[in-house]
Amino acid sequence: VVSPSEMVHSLAAVAARNGVEFLFEQEVVGIDQVAAGAEDGARMVVKTAKGLEVRTRFVVNAAGLFSDKVAEMVGLHDFVIKPRKGEEYLLDKNMSYVTKRVILPVPTKVSKGILITPTVDETIMCGPTAVDTDDRYDLTCTPEGCQTIFSFVSKMCTEINDRQVIASFAGLRAAANTGDFIIGPTAVKGFINA
């Protein structure tokens, strides 16, 4: 078990030390293909809503919920992304005794299931749900999500209930209509889905 935020910060720090430049808050609004033989070797120009233009040989499409929209910018229509909402609930630290290991059920077709997970901070996380939605921006936690999680979790560990919740979180995962992850090169040279 790792701290996801600490892990991402560490990966970003290593990338920056190796020359990666991060451009935050830059919504991609267009990708133009460059004619073959450009002097700088560029194949594409990525355009942002703030007017930035980046000439590049490669585009790695890691846009998550919007990766289908980014792929469409270069004429690819190979997949559709639908958001899958997951809610998780953090329990009070006094519940840390219930497990030191991840407790997980048999996975379903759409999810690894609802887990009981100890965190690096010695709290317990319960969840997530896996609910398909059309809203790519909805990060709300719901009474239905809470009910779903705790009715399931209480069967695995009778000592856990929703009265021990100290925080709740919701996120959206990208679920492709292909039934699998979309990773690899595409028909557009230099455009890679990740």
Residue ranges with predicted function:
Residues N61-L76:
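Flavin (primarily FAD) binding-site architecture
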Residues V2-A36, D40-K50, V54-F58:
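Helical element adjacent to the flavin cofactor pocket in flavoenzyme catalytic cores
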Residues F79-V80, Y97-R101, E159-A167:
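Acidic/polar loop patches that form or flank catalytic/metal-binding clefts of enzymes
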Residues A16-E21, Q33, E72-G75, N94, ...:
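Generic secondary-structure signature for well-ordered alpha-helical cores
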Residues E88-V131:
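Conserved FAD-binding catalytic core of PHBH/FMO-like flavoproteins
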Residues F22-F24, N61, C126, A167:
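General beta-strand structural signal in soluble alpha/beta enzymes
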Residues S10, T108-D121, D132-A194:
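C-terminal catalytic lobe of FAD-dependent flavoproteins
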